[in-house]
């Protein structure tokens, strides 16, 4: 069953009739905001409300993680974990076709209203495992923006990350790519006094998620080993700064930051933090020691499709 919200198609064929996760009343508030305001008004709303969730879901700066990437109108994109549509809009502007998937009908409705002019956007509501099993279309890109770390929650397998990657791999065209954005559990901000983004506890990732189940981020070396061990040998790392959520600069191995560039570090909009040391000076030390890539707060990883006989 399909619904139309503006020019967007809301596909409910795989929706089970209830949302299994929610941020509560703030989602209802977000729905009202996007129903009654245009994107040009969002920045004024953010400044007026001073609310983390409103900023997180409506800020145009969220799009920076993919605004620069060379997706074209010849390309099709599968967006997994689309949420309230912070990234769906920029994908729809760049690509020829976007299929966005999310488990929540409420969040998908917010997405549809937020991007209601995007006639090339189809939002499929439902568990990705079910959607994946019924999806025959293949895509040039599959995006995992803040999604891969939750694989253990939704895939009940002994090797959930491998299963998730291989499930995604089947939906890529030849020469297709996975585009992943994820926090670095050894990001400098976590040493400097920021709480772990997903669980809100100090040093939780640094200490190996000893009090956490269901979500896990990785260091650069851990992510490289995970990809290599599962046959994904062709990948490239980028380094969003200050992080992937509100990136202002995207660095790469061929263009790394210079001393003095990384000074925009008080970005804890969602929670209080400690200031244990001067992050700018610490970044300078990492840069001089050629260790920035390992202490970047986030990663953006471009992963080439794995050939079926490549393990």
Residue ranges of predicted features:
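Rossmann-like AdoMet/SAM-dependent catalytic core
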Residues: 222, 236, 240-311
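Conserved class I S-adenosyl-L-methionine
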Residues: 179-201
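Short alpha-helix
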Residues: 213-231, 235-237
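A short glycine-rich, Lys/Arg-flanked "PGG" loop and its adjoining helix->strand segment in the class I
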Residues: 159-177
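Conserved SAM-binding loop of SAM-dependent methyltransferases across substrates and taxa
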Residues: 84-95
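N-terminal auxiliary segments of SAM/dcSAM-dependent transferases
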Residues: 1-37
């Amino acid at each position: 069953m399909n619904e139309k919200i503006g020019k967007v198609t809301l596909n409910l064929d795989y929706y089970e009739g209830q949302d299994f996760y929610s941020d509560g009343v703030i989602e209802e508030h977000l729905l009202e905001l996007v129903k009654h305001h245009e994107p040009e008004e969002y920045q004024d709303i953010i400044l007026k409300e001073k609310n983390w969730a409103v900023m997180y879901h409506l800020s145009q700066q969220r799009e920076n993680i993919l605004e620069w990437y060379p997706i074209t109108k010849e390309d099709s994109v599968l967006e997994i974990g689309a949420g309230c549509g912070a990234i769906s809009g920029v994908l729809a502007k760049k690509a020829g076709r976007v299929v966005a998937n999310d488990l929540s009908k409420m969040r998908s409705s917010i997405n549809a209203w937020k991007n209601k002019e995007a006639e090339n956007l189809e939002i499929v509501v439902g568990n990705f495992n079910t959607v994946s099993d019924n999806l025959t279309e293949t895509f040039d890109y599959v995006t995992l923006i803040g999604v891969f770390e939750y694989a253990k929650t939704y895939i009940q397998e002994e090797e959930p990350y491998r299963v998730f990657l291989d499930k995604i791999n089947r939906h890529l065209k030849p020469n297709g790519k996975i585009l992943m954005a994820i926090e670095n559990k050894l990001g400098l901000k976590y040493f400097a006094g920021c709480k772990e983004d997903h669980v809100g506890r100090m040093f939780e990732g640094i200490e190996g998620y000893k009090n956490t189940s269901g979500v896990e981020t990785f260091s650069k070396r851990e992510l490289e080993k995970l990809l290599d061990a599962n046959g994904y040998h062709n990948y490239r790392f980028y380094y969003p700064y200050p992080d992937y959520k509100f990136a202002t600069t995207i660095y790469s191995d061929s263009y790394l930051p210079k001393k003095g560039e990384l000074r925009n570090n008080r970005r804890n909009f969602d929670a209080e933090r400690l200031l244990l040391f001067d992050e700018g000076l610490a970044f300078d030390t990492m840069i001089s020691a050629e260790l920035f890539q390992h202490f970047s707060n986030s990663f953006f990883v471009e992963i080439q499709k794995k050939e079926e006989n490549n393990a």
